[in-house]
């Protein structure tokens, strides 16, 4: 089989001669088109790799007016959730022949706006955005520029923009129902306000489970704390704030905690282990994301599992539809969740 010399570029015509297929079939196979049988695609792609074929992205872009590149603007990368989402988005994009440009806003509106401008300057076809509470201005800017985009993991309202999220209300309901099933009836919801919409959806699920179990309002507690992942957040103040709140809840007889996400639940478990007055507290903990189900995580958490791969597939497909002219009203895709039980929530002693 003829190899690429490093001087003479391998063309689709070369691959067609080598495989016996038409240039059109080779073209479709190399672009992973579904109209070509999988076995044929795989054979052509294997031959192309062996011959050293490299597609001409610039020429393709000039012909189509598109770059087949998407920008992904992530939040704060200290949270392992974003690494998992980045992996699954990469897989979904590759299956649809898109390249990705990853950026990080650190959950800051000013950086988010800078990232959007940088993505637009690089002529991306569309943007997957993990928004902040202040993203409405970014959304207005994207709409004004005519750049297709989808909000990932977080919504800002049902009619604001396309979004793909997990079922946050149902997830919170499952989490709190599990606490109640284990005999815990004095319950607390510990959250941040990174996204008000997410906080409120999970609060709805928290209250639905409590209502069904007949738990009175005086036995339901909520606390919104500092965000420890923000660069401008005073870590010591956050630690002290959480410690004081947990000490207070113990005095009030709280025996079950629903925590907004795994990252925060791990911080809570650290406080419980490091604070002598809290070390023997019989409190169940359930959180959200199930990071432990995907990668190593330093906590044995009972957690609501999001279908990361399905969220990524839905987001890429929705964005692709918009790129190709889909003009439907904003679509809000909600992916199912399930509860994964571990040692952080056991029957009450």
Residue ranges with predicted function:
Residues 1-66, 346-349:
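N-terminal helix-turn-helix DNA-binding module of bacterial transcription factors
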Residues 1-11, 65-177, 181, 195, ...:
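Alpha-helical recognition/docking segments in bacterial nutrient-uptake
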Residues 18, 23-28, 62-78, 178, ...:
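Short beta-strand segments enriched in small/hydrophobic residues
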Residues 43, 80-95, 171-174, 197-220, ...:
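Short, solvent-exposed amphipathic alpha-helices that sit
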Residues 93-105, 207-238:
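Short beta-strand elements in bilobed, periplasmic/extracellular small-molecule ligand-binding domains
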Residues 164-189, 201-208, 235-247, 265, ...:
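Hydrophobic alpha-helical segments within soluble ligand-binding/sensing domains
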Residues 175-215, 331-346:
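An alpha-beta-alpha
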Residues 239, 243-349:
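Flexible loop/turn connectors
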């Amino acid at each position: 089989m003829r190899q690429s010399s490093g001087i003479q570029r391998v063309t689709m015509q070369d691959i067609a001669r080598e495989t016996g297929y038409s240039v059109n079939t080779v073209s479709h196979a190399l672009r992973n088109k579904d109209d070509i049988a999988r076995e044929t695609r795989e054979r052509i792609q294997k031959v192309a790799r062996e011959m050293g074929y490299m597609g001409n992205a610039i020429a393709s872009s000039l012909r189509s007016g598109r770059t087949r590149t998407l920008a992904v603007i992530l939040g704060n990368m200290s949270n392992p959730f974003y690494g998992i989402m980045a992996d699954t988005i990469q897989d979904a994009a590759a299956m649809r022949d898109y390249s990705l440009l990853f950026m990080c806003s650190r959950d800051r509106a000013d950086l988010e706006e800078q990232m959007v401008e940088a993505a637009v300057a690089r002529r991306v076809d569309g943007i997957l955005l993990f928004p902040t509470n202040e993203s409405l201005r970014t959304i207005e800017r994207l709409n004004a520029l005519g750049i297709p985009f989808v909000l990932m993991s977080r919504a800002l309202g049902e009619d604001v923009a396309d979004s793909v999220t997990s079922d946050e209300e149902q997830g919170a309901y499952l989490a709190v129902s599990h606490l109640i099933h284990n005999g815990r009836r004095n319950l607390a919801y510990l959250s941040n306000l990174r996204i008000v919409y997410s906080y409120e959806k999970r609060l709805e699920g928290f209250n639905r489970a409590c209502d069904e179990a007949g738990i009175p309002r005086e036995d339901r507690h909520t606390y919104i704390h500092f965000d420890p992942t923000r660069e401008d957040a005073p870590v010591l103040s956050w630690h002290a704030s959480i410690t004081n709140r947990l000490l207070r809840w113990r005095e009030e007889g709280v025996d079950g905690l629903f925590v907004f996400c795994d990252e925060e639940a791990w911080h809570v478990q650290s406080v419980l282990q490091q604070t002598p007055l809290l070390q023997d507290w019989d409190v169940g903990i359930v959180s959200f994301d199930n990071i432990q189900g995907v990668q190593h995580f330093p906590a044995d958490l009972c957690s609501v599992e999001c279908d990361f791969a399905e969220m990524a597939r839905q987001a890429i497909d929705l964005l692709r539809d918009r790129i190709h002219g889909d003009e439907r009203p904003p679509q809000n895709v909600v992916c199912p969740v399930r509860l994964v039980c571990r040692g952080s929530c056991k029957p009450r002693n």
